[in-house]
């Protein structure tokens, strides 16, 4: 008889226990790729408007007062999308919310490609943002639910490593297409078309993903959860029946946990920690990526040069994400978040002071690389610290505040850049990042290598 790893043997324990005992299967890998590709187009889209900011100023003859609303429109849409779709994922399932958000984004990104005015582009960016808003927290929640504890961090980091390739891709595509017309259509419009078509392809890929067994169990659909876990166990043993027909029996459904539990005695410390974290971290993470072409223009570089430099610094995003792979399971994620965000503050100040092309590229690359060690660690971390019944609501709800802060960011940082220059801009950003580090260091629990139920048992009593 073939030797079967202990992790592959069906467990008679809970659904969560059996999921955590599984080895990595083909379904886990397929889910990681499908989630990573969806995130790829999320980040592609988020940075697209910022990368094109200098191009759109010329295309639509935008004034300094008209540019910030256009930059903010996607983020404001993402705020509403994260709130609405994140809650839907806890009430009606992760998979359906996944499909809805990609469908909305793909449709409105395609419509945005045919914008005849800045107003139409602003409106389509807003609705595309609604579709995109919940993508990262939904991705974090879904993979956190599905993956076994000992591999959770590494595979979520792999998904984000794939996703972060979207940053240099959009940078180099913008550099290559914006100065040309293809089939009589301006190159910048093709960037929106490519994003829409790519997201549509990922939509089709995600239709084959299973629902989260942890979520099914949390709402009382235990027979369906049992069926999915049994399929994963059979797959782990080399069985061929990976997706048999679900059972027809009825199950008792439970209502989703009320949102007020997030501010109850059990969870309010973690909730408020993430509120502060999400509002301030976006100044450092998206503030750099969105505004770097404008920062380079303020340093005296032409539009074409600033797009090239931005694309080169964006290479740090996938590199940093890849560097995080051996770290997220070996270093306590709480301290990895703290250390990397402090490094971002240092490199950001150095970038602001840089006056030569070489220093701009070096510190820009170091900043983006470090920021994705930070990003991977926190995306894993934020989903681990809330119980299954509220995981998507909590992750998406607090994440939505980062989108709202990103929407306000152009109205604060662009005038600051124009009035005080890049150095002052990055000093302000660094101060925000130091507060983020203190917030997590003081209030955050440890999570690395722990089962989700263990991380949340210490606060779960009032939820039972």
Residue ranges and their predicted role:
Residues 1-464:
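Transmembrane-helix signature of 12-pass secondary carriers
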């Amino acid at each position: 008889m073939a030797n079967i790893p202990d992790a592959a043997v069906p467990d008679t324990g809970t659904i969560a226990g059996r999921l955590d005992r599984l080895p990595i299967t083909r379904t886990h890998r397929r889910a990681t790729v499908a989630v990573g590709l969806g995130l790829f187009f999320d980040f592609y889209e988020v940075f697209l408007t910022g990368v094109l900011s200098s191009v759109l100023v010329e295309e639509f003859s935008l004034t300094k007062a008209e540019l910030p609303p256009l930059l903010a429109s996607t983020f404001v849409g993402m705020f509403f999308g994260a709130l609405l779709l994140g809650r839907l994922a806890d009430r009606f399932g992760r998979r359906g919310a996944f499909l809805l958000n990609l469908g909305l984004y793909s449709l409105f990104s395609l419509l945005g490609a045919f914008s005849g005015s800045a107003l139409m582009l602003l409106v389509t960016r807003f609705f595309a943002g609604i579709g995109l808003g919940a993508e990262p927290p939904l991705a974090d929640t879904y993979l956190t639910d599905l993956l076994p504890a000992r591999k959770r961090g590494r595979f979520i980091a792999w998904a984000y490593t794939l996703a972060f390739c979207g940053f240099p891709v959009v940078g180099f595509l913008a550099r290559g297409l914006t100065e040309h017309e293809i089939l009589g259509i301006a190159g910048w419009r093709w960037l929106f078309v490519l994003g829409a078509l790519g997201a549509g392809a990922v939509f089709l890929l995600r239709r084959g993903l299973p629902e989260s067994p942890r979520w099914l169990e949390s709402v009382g659909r235990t027979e369906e959860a049992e069926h999915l876990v049994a399929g994963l166990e059979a797959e782990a043993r080399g069985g061929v029946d990976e997706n048999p027909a679900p059972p027809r029996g009825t199950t008792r459904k439970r209502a989703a946990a009320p949102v007020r539990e997030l501010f109850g005695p059990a969870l309010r410390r973690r909730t408020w920690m993430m509120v502060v974290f999400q509002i301030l971290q976006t100044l450092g993470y998206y503030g750099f990526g969105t505004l770097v072409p404008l920062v380079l223009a303020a340093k005296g570089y032409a539009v074409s040069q600033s797009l090239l430099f931005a694309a080169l610094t964006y290479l740090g995003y996938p590199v940093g994400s890849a560097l995080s792979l051996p770290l997220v399971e070996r270093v306590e994620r709480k301290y990895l978040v703290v250390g990397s965000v402090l490094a971002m503050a240092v490199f950001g100040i150095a970038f602001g002071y840089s006056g030569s092309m070489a220093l701009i590229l070096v510190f820009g690359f170091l900043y983006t690389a470090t920021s994705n060690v930070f990003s991977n660690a926190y995306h894993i971390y934020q989903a681990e610290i809330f119980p299954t019944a509220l995981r998507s609501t909590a992750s998406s709800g607090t994440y939505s505040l980062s989108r709202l802060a990103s929407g306000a960011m152009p109205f604060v940082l662009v005038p600051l850049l124009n009035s005080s220059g890049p150095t002052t801009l990055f000093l302000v950003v660094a101060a925000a990042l130091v507060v983020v580090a203190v917030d997590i260091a003081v209030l955050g629990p440890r999570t690395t290598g722990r089962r989700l139920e263990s991380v949340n048992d210490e606060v779960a009593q009032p939820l039972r």
